[in-house]
Each structure stands twice: as structure tokens, then as C-alpha cells.
Design a protein with these regions (language model features):
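Hydrophobic secretory-pathway targeting helix
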Residues: 3-61
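Alpha-helical transmembrane segments and their helix-start/interface "positive-inside/aromatic belt" motifs
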Residues: 25-31, 216-229, 321-327
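Transmembrane alpha-helical segments that form the functional core of multipass membrane systems
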Residues: 150-154, 162-257, 267-278
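Structural detector for short beta-strands of small beta-barrel domains
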Residues: 59-86
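Extended, hydrophilic extramembrane loops/domains of integral membrane proteins
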Residues: 109-144
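Hydrophobic alpha-helical transmembrane segments of membrane transport and translocation systems
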Residues: 319-322, 331-333, 337-423, 427, ...
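Alpha-helical transmembrane segments of multipass membrane proteins
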Residues: 36, 40, 178, 203, ...
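Generic detector of multi-pass transmembrane helix bundles and their immediately adjacent loops
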Residues: 237-361, 368
Length: 444
């Protein structure tokens, strides 16, 4: 009987039991991870907020959002040197109180890049002081960002469907963990090294379990990702010592030292956290891509040996090396392009430029992240080769592989029949031996 005949006749109910079992396990683990994530973020926030301190602007009211309802006046002025500007008066409705107020915006030529003049219908932020009254401070830009974010979420749901929804949930927990747990831990002066490692571990496990469920593919991805992140962390820790870094990369670094004098923020630990958190995303991508590819290969070719599976993984990994390393390097360059250009302009010596701490940190981020990716590839391939040796076709509880499942059932059925036949033959041999023994005894 063919393997498809087995699935169609003998083991159809067995297949349904396997599928139901893995779906049930997936749901239980999914709910457990979500509950744990909620508890982790809640109690983590409570703990890290114990010594949380912020520098508040004393004597200044909070910023208020508003909508301009009318432009009442625009007055131009000119300085003796020929430069000038405009003072624009307007009426505005505050969103939080509904109060109708009058405010002003000053657009001055001395500003390097002057703001666009306000118009009716603009959504803005205003501050109030006793001397100048209500003053324009900034345009509200979050509305447009929310629209773009909504498009991103809709695209995730449209293209990813269930996995897209799981991606959104895992991304939400990741952002909450960073902004509600890790950032308060940094500000309150706690051990940034431990918290950054803990957040990375939580993010890796939570993301992979929510997106892929509890299976061998998730396990290999987690192990491979941990390997790459640990290597990146160890390299960063020792390189910050070897390079004699201080952690002061720009003016904002000095500001961090004044936030919590009782529990000073470790600037070197900030660099450590920035590097491993930045590298974690790329390393996780590589580990998951390799694990998924080799998992699919194993399901399609059940007879492939661990050695051949490792070789196939390395072939796939080599194709990923260049693009992922470029992605990481270009991401770091793009995120600090303005500062990099400014530093280049004011430093004529290439030697001095390459030894600026800000540039050194950017190079360190790119190199450590790339090394982490390179190490992740063979490490993940090795883990997959070891753990996929006894892989079951129904181990992947997200997408059931019909052909591989039937092939596995056929092999299991043949093994059961062989064991049953051997057992039957053994019993027959034993019965024959007993019968012959009795016949011999009767002769005497």
C-alpha cells in the first residue's frame, strides 16, 4: 500500500489526532507566553520605577495641543543688517481643555532652518509663560505617523494573516518591554548589563514562541540567536575596555550623567546595550531564516544526513552573509548620517576622524553586529543538523506537511508490522520448541 493510501485509509484519524494535539499545545503555550509577557512588563515596570527620576522644567506649564482656527495678524520686521522675520498671531482651540486662546509664532531669519508659517487648520503644540503668553513650539506630527503605522499594521495583517497578527503582538510586547521596563531601569541607575541581556533573552524567546509556536524550529532559532547575541555581547564588553571608551559620544551623553546623581547612569553600559539590542534583530532574522529553510529541507528529504543538512545550511548562509552584513552597516550609517557628515566637515585629518569616539562606536556597532551574524550562521546550521536528526513531519504545528507526514506514517507502519511479525514468529518458534520437547519426553 502506498504512503498516500495509508493516510487515506488506515491513519486518517491518527493524523487528525496529531494535528489537534499540536494545535492544542500551541494554543496553551501561546496563552502562557502572552500572560507571562503581561506580568513581566507590569511587574518589571513597577520594579524599575522605584528610583525613577526625570528632570522637569520648573516654572513652565505643560505643553498643550491645539488646532488653529484663525490667523488674526501677520507682522513683518527687519533688523539693521537686513535680516528680519515675521510675527504671526492666531486663534487656537486647545484640544485638552476646549479653551479658545490667542497665540503667536515667530519666524526669524536667524533660525538656521525657519519653521513653516502656521495656517488655519494646523495642529500645533503651544507653551505658555507670563511674559509672552501662548507661543507656538512645534507642529503635531504624530497624526501622520499614526496613519503610516496603521498602514504598516494593515499590510502585516494582509500579507501575513495569522503570522502577521502574531508579529504585531510580539512587536507590541517588545516595545513595551524596552520603553516601560528597560528605559526606566537605565534611568533609575540599575545594572544596565544585566537588564539589556535579560530584555534580549525575553524578546528572543517571546517573539519566536508567539510567531512560530513551540516546535523544533523555534528551539533551533532560539539557540542560534542566543549564540550570536552572546558573542556580540562578549566582544562589545572587551572591546570597550581595549578601545578605552568613556561612553561620551555626544552632548547628550553629558546630560545623562545629571539625570540621577544618586544612581549614576553607566555610559559604557549604554553602548553595550545599544550594540547587542541593535544586533539582536539581525541575528534573530538570520537564525530564523536558516532554521526555517533547513526545517523545510528536512521535511522534504527525510533521508538527508546531518552532515549534508549542515552543508546545505552553510550554502544558504553564505548567500545571506553579504546582504545581512550590508543591512546592518547601512542601518548604522543611515541612522547617524547627519552627525557623521558634520564630524567629517570639521575634521580635516582622517586619523583624527577615525579616532573620534562617536565614529569608533559606530564602527564598533557595525563590526560586532556583523561578526555576530557570521557566527550565527554556522552555529545555527550545526544546531539544526543535530536537532533535526529525529525530526517528525508533524513537528511543525503551523503548517502541516501532508507528504512528509504520510511518509513517516508509512515507515512507522512498516516498523510496527515488522515487530508484530517478529513477535509472532518468536511465539511460533517457542510453541514449536515446547511441542518438540514434549514429544521427546513421551518417547522415554
Amino acid at each position: 500500500m502506498t504512503i498516500f493510501g495509508i493516510c487515506d485509509t488506515i491513519t486518517r484519524n491518527e493524523k487528525e489526532v496529531f494535528v489537534l494535539s499540536y494545535k492544542t499545545k500551541n494554543i496553551i503555550v501561546y496563552i502562557a507566553v502572552v500572560i507571562f509577557s503581561i506580568l513581566f512588563c507590569y511587574f518589571g515596570n513597577k520594579y524599575t520605577m522605584a528610583n525613577y527620576k526625570l528632570l522637569n522644567n520648573q516654572g513652565v506649564d505643560a505643553t498643550h495641543p491645539g488646532v488653529i482656527t484663525e490667523i488674526t495678524n501677520e507682522q513683518d520686521y527687519t533688523y539693521q543688517n537686513g535680516l528680519g522675520g515675521s510675527k504671526i498671531s492666531f486663534k487656537c482651540t486647545l484640544k485638552d481643555t476646549g479653551e479658545e486662546i490667542e497665540g503667536t509664532q515667530v519666524v526669524d531669519d536667524y533660525d538656521p532652518v525657519p519653521y513653516r508659517k502656521v495656517t488655519k487648520g494646523d495642529k500645533i503644540l503651544l507653551d505658555y509663560d507670563d511674559t509672552n503668553g501662548w507661543q507656538f513650539t512645534e507642529y503635531i506630527r504624530t497624526d501622520a505617523l499614526l496613519v503610516l503605522g496603521a498602514i504598516f499594521l494593515i499590510a502585516l495583517l494582509f500579507f501575513g494573516r495569522t503570522k502577521g497578527l502574531n508579529t504585531i503582538i510580539s512587536l507590541g510586547f517588545t516595545c513595551i518591554a524596552i520603553f516601560a521596563v528597560f528605559i526606566p531601569a537605565v534611568i533609575s541607575g540599575q545594572n544596565i548589563y544585566l537588564w539589556s541581556v535579560g530584555i534580549c533573552a525575553y524578546t528572543i524567546i517571546m517573539t519566536l514562541l508567539i510567531v512560530n509556536g513551540p516546535n523544533t524550529k523555534t528551539l533551533t532559532s532560539c539557540i542560534g540567536c542566543f549564540g550570536g547575541v552572546v558573542l556580540a555581547g562578549v566582544l562589545t564588553f572587551f572591546m570597550t575596555k581595549i578601545l578605552a571608551l568613556t561612553g561620551v559620544v555626544d552632548e547628550s551623553s553629558y546630560s545623562l550623567t545629571t539625570v540621577n546623581p544618586d544612581h549614576p547612569i553607566d555610559l559604557l553600559a549604554i553602548i553595550f546595550a545599544a550594540i547587542i539590542i541593535g544586533a539582536m534583530g539581525a541575528v534573530m532574522d538570520v537564525a530564523m531564516s536558516l532554521s526555517s529553510s533547513l526545517h523545510e529541507l528536512k521535511l522534504k528529504v527525510m533521508s538527508i544526513s546531518p552532515k549534508e543538512l549542515f552543508k546545505s545550511g552553510m550554502v544558504i548562509g553564505r548567500d545571506m552573509m553579504g546582504t545581512m552584513a550590508n543591512t546592518l552597516v547601512l542601518a548604522y550609517i543611515g541612522s547617524s548620517l547627519t552627525v557623521t557628515v558634520l564630524i567629517v566637515i570639521y575634521n580635516s585629518s582622517m586619523t583624527e576622524l577615525l579616532n573620534k569616539e562617536r565614529i569608533v562606536v559606530e564602527i564598533l556597532q557595525a563590526l560586532v553586529g556583523s561578526i555576530g551574524i557570521l557566527f550565527t550562521i554556522p552555529f545555527t546550521c550545526f544546531v539544526c543538523a543535530m536537532l533535526y536528526r529525529n525530526l517528525k513531519p508533524y513537528d511543525n504545528n503551523v503548517e502541516f506537511d501532508e507528504y512528509a507526514y504520510c511518509q513517516q506514517l508509512a515507515e512507522e507502519k512498516e516498523a510496527r508490522e515488522a515487530r508484530a511479525l517478529a513477535k509472532k514468529q518468536a511465539k511460533e518458534e517457542e510453541a514449536r520448541a515446547i511441542k518438540e520437547g514434549k514429544e521427546e519426553a513421551n518417547k522415554f
